[in-house]
């Protein structure tokens, strides 16, 4: 009987361990230094996401932080979360009106761009997750801080429910 109870407790503990490993930690932290800074300038008419992806490929960037971005756009396309469900629904916004590009932030995770933009004119400020179709008006300048290729940060852009 004692062995049977131990066996049941072991299965119970194994179940808890497996369940715990499947759960995402509340906080994940990695430490790194910047290897270098890349400053990317995109000319008028360039799609911002396409330009970022082109620079990532050309410079062979694996992990990086998008530190800043400025410029102006003729067209924009972004999405924002639109409810509290997991996974959340997305609301997409697309327009063909000029706005100032006041901020670009994000990450390059295992070579994949995840960027957010903020746009403004004299009446409003809008922004969200950068989508294809956001095109530079005068220009766009985006500054990227390159991190170590060894960092395991791709998981930061994934979520579990």
Task: Label the predicted regions.
Residues 16-20:
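Sec/Tat signal peptide C-region and signal peptidase I cleavage site
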Residues 1-4:
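Positively charged n-region of N-terminal signal peptides that target proteins for export
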Residues 6-15:
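Bacterial N-terminal signal peptides
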Residues 21-57, 62-68, 74-114, 119-161:
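N-terminal intrinsically disordered, cationic/polar leader segments
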């Amino acid at each position: 009987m004692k062995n049977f109870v131990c066996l049941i407790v072991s299965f119970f503990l194994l179940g808890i361990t497996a369940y715990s490993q499947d759960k995402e930690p509340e906080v994940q932290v990695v430490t790194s230094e910047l290897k270098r800074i890349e400053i990317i300038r995109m000319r008028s008419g360039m799609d911002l996401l396409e330009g970022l992806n082109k620079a990532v490929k050309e410079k062979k960037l694996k992990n990086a932080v998008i530190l800043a971005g400025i410029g102006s756009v003729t067209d924009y396309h972004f999405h924002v979360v639109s409810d509290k469900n997991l996974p959340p629904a997305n609301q997409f916004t697309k327009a063909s009106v000029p706005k100032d590009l006041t901020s670009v932030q994000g990450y390059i995770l295992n070579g994949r761009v995840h960027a957010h933009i903020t746009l403004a004119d004299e009446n409003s400020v809008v922004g969200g997750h950068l989508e294809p179709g956001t095109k530079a008006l005068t220009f766009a300048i985006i500054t990227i801080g390159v991190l170590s290729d060894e960092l395991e940060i791709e998981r930061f852009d994934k979520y579990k429910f």
